[in-house]
Amino acid sequence: MYALAIIRYRKPLEDVLKHTDSHRAYLQGLKQEGVLLASGPLVPRHGGVLLLRVPDNEAQQTLDSIRDNDPYVRFGVAQYELWPWSVGIGAEDLDRL
């Protein structure tokens, strides 16, 4: 299963930037595990988006864990919206990632 995570900053950008290095290190770990396929900030910079691949049988538990362990969430500078996603067009391309 795929999912989109919309990250919205809850604090001023200067507060968010204090935790950006640890947030990016966390995301690199998810990428190495094959969970994170792509990520990046929104423009203008008021949050970001993650494209995730999670096991069908543990999707909600995995998504909750991803959210709860993100340093942005742990330090209270951002919140997540999690959207399980049923990919139609392009699914075969994502499956190759």
Give the residues covered by each predicted segment.
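Conserved, structured core segments of small domains
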Residues: M1-L97
